[in-house]
Amino acid sequence: MCPLSQIWRPICPILGNVTRSLSLPLHSALELLGGLALLAGPFLLGAGPAGLVAAISLGALLIGMALAGPDALPITAHQSFDLMLVAVLAGAGLGLALSGDLAGGVVLAVVGALELTLVSLTRWVRA
């Protein structure tokens, strides 16, 4: 649905094509893959100690959210946690990259971008 504001009208055809087509079970499965990527990625790319600690900690959180049952949290809480995790992944990725741990920063930033895409494409309704 396109907003009625005159400012948004030029991009309405672009925004109108985005659909929220991922179900919550598929969201959880893809979130699990993202968490596993956070656990394995820094080791494969040779990240430093700070990158390893950050990625393993955030990967464990992401896997925990993916494996939580469908009634473990309200949907809005899960969505809010996912958005908060995106912000933390982006901030930690930027911090690691600026401190010299480029491999760790790239892993966190890529998983953060993928998580943001996942959140934006998910239908936030119980099946």
Q: Where do the PLM segments sit?
A:
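Juxtamembrane loop-transmembrane helix junctions in multi-pass integral membrane proteins
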Residues: L15-P25, G46-P49, V53, L73-A77, ...
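C-terminal ends of transmembrane helices
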Residues: L15-T19, M65-P74, V119-W124
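Hydrophobic, membrane-facing alpha-helical anchors
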Residues: C2-L15, L33-A37, I56-G69
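Structural signature of hydrophobic alpha-helical transmembrane segments
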Residues: P49-L61, G105-V111
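Intrinsic N-terminal pre-sequences and regulatory tails
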Residues: M1-A29, V125-A127
